[in-house]
Amino acid sequence: MIPGSTSGISFSRILSRQASHQDATQHTDAQQAEIQQAAEDSSPGAEVQKFVQSTDEMSAALAQFRNRRDYEKKSSNLSNSFERVLEDEALPKAKQILKLISVHGGALEDFLRQARSLFPDPSDLVLVLRELLRRKDLEEIVRKKLESLLKHVEEQTDPKTLKAGINCALKARLFGKTLSLKPGLLRASYRQFIQSESHEVEIYSDWIASYGYQRRLVVLDFIEGSLLTDIDANDASCSRLEFGQLLRRLTQLKMLRSADLLFVSTLLSYSFTKAFNAEESSWLLLMLSLLQQPHEVDSLLADIIGLNALLLSHKEHASFLQIFYQVCKAIPSSLFYEEYWQEELLMALRSMTDIAYKHEMAEQRRTIEKLS
């Protein structure tokens, strides 16, 4: 044996075995520690401690969630409280009113003038003042000023105008976004509707003039939605009797809308009608004009058709008048200013159709004579 070689080999093996032994020992110790820890953790005292700890953690998480939810709710309520105020920058302007009121001194008329400069519409101003009065941290002198200001505004404003403006505000905001219009304009239209004594055709025509013929259908949807909301409101703008009359007017307006759609779509479905005039707005204007002045049908048709009529044959004229007669006959007589006006209109159209038919026959005879 080579001296030293055995001890070297033995040493390396010993190191290897020693390392293995230490690993095994450490592993065994670790296992024993885990077993001991598990035993301790499974003891009744440990279980109670773990339960208390987990409960504390859950309580802390719930408290954090509740605080965040309460904060979001307060922020949402602050925003929602001014949702029916249609004036731009309502919240900053409301704070400005509160700041002005908080300054001691000054006459009520001065406060009123400044408040109206910020909120020109009385419904907006009343909503803002009512909301400010809900605050619990107001000084007594500030609260009394706000109450006096609110009372003054309510007394000076027509109740129907005030309540209607408040009750239709959310609908005005919603439809304002849909139509890309200022909601205050829609609110004004609803107020005008519930107080107007004009004929339904005039009301419908005013909407077209104000909003454009493309929006006429949606504007009526807004009026209907606002009226139903107003009826269900705790502080409605009208009496039951008045609402009954308004619902009848609404029915007439919806009937007018249906007649309008049928009249225009039927006429524009024919190519020779489009040859006369292809504009939807022109035929809509014609129908509304006929409801108000059917005796002028000849001149009204001439305005719509114009010189294009000269380019068409007598046969096409007669065909057009026959179709036009049918669409006018389909209009409910109750939509005319006077119901008997529809029959007078139809009589005039029959006369015009007879003349056109005679011209058509004469034209055919001339054609036959030329061929023979």
Swiss-Prot record:
Polar residues bias: start-end ranges: 1-19
Localization per record: Cell membrane
Natural source organism: Salmonella typhi
Impact reported for residue 64 to E: In strain: RKS3333
Location of region: Disordered: 1-47
Protein's recorded name: Invasion protein InvE
Gene3D superfamilies (UniProt xref): 1.10.150.630, 1.20.1280.240
A biological process from GO: negative regulation of protein secretion
Keyword terms, alphabetized: Cell membrane, Membrane, Virulence
UniProt topology in membrane: Peripheral membrane protein
Chain's role: Involved in the triggering of intracellular events that lead to microbial internalization. These events include increase in calcium level, redistribution of actin microfilaments, and changes in the normal structure of the microvilli. Encoded within the type III secretion system (SPI-1 T3SS), it is essential for the translocation of protein effectors into host cells. Forms a complex with SipB and SipC in the presence of their chaperone SicA.
Family annotation (InterPro entries): HrpJ-like (IPR010812), Invas_InvE (IPR003520), T3SS_LcrE (IPR013401)
GO cellular component terms listed in the entry, alphabetical order: cell surface; outer membrane; plasma membrane
